[in-house]
């Protein structure tokens, strides 16, 4: 298990429940922490963050997957491969493949949406962090999700809000069809389900970040949650020392 600060770690692969290859990196030893990336992104987004560096320095084992449809993982072109919480099932399978009995999960942005659903399905998660997220994802008809799902559909008419996302996705050679299906079938976790979570959860967000709703409302919906507000906007807060400090303190 190599340790690499600020550079992309070596990718490994496992075959998920439906035959899709899922890429991941696995660095360090100690208590396992899974980092779950956001939309139009992949696991390498964590490489330049303070939190990944400090987790490794403090002796944690850091596991970083590329969610299906992203990065080096499989990008199937049929819609059926993105339904029924497929991404969550991939992560459950990865944890089993790596023989993790208890572990920690840190999600950011859309990664927090995936992590929230995972929390409701897997008792092996000891602690978790939901970063850059409010309560809006609990609505199955969330207009922001639908807006971006439609934007990534073939031949879609773009709005001022979605033009930038499409341009960025093209610039990083992301798979537009996969991104469409990922948004269309994004997991939904109800407020009731959040209220049933028994493990400890940290909600952390930048003070300029309301892109996905009010993070304090998410904190209030999860009984055993803590809340940390740090400086920063949605795209920058998770890279900062303040984000890392909040998480490292929570994990002690």
Name each model feature, range by range:
Residues 85-102:
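Conserved acidic catalytic loop of the alpha/beta-hydrolase fold
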Residues 31-38:
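Short beta-strand element of the alpha/beta-hydrolase
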Residues 113-124, 128-155:
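Flexible "cap/lid" loop of the alpha/beta hydrolase fold
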Residues 55-74:
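Conserved alpha/beta-hydrolase
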Residues 231-252:
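Catalytic active-site module of serine/aspartate enzymes centered on a nucleophile-bearing elbow/loop
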Residues 207-232:
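Conserved loop-alpha-helix segment in the C-terminal half of the alpha/beta-hydrolase fold
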Residues 197, 203-205:
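Short beta-strand/loop motif that positions the catalytic acidic residue
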Residues 40-52:
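The serine-hydrolase catalytic nucleophile loop
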